[in-house]
Amino acid sequence: SKRAQVSFVKNKERDLAVIALLLSTGVRLSELVNLDMQDVNLATRTITVIRKGGKKDVVNIAPFGLPYIERYLEIRKGRYSASDSDKAFFLTTQNKVPARLGTRSVELLVKKLSTAYGKPTTPHKLRHTLATRLYEQTKDSLLVSQQLGHKGTAMVEVYAHVAAETTKEALSDL
């Protein structure tokens, strides 16, 4: 529809930055939508989030996510009528007034863009993807659990299992 096209064009940089940040950090949806401008440090490639249980944590951003985040920041002020008092990192507009992008909006935009790409997914599956790839790359459960903000390494066994399945499939393809 015409409205959907207008929305896509208006929000393209933001939506790609949302997906890039989810994929390049593995943060939870709640951590993403609660990000403020002061929490994002591109110079150090980190974001500061409030984890489950209210604990502050500094999370590294994989380099591939940076160009999308930088592009969004270039258009954020003008496109979303943001002033310095608009602290939310990801914005939408309601009646031309900037507002924090909500969890449901992020779920819908991830679903819409990923479905259009032929790979329907969710914000949590993007977190899972980062964890699996990081584990495959490092085989380091502690490193993966720290990146995801898990208290222990038990949850990482899920990603290790996925990596083992991937290995099995790869061997079958030889």
Sequence positions of predicted segments:
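Conserved catalytic core of the tyrosine transesterase superfamily
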Residues: 1-174
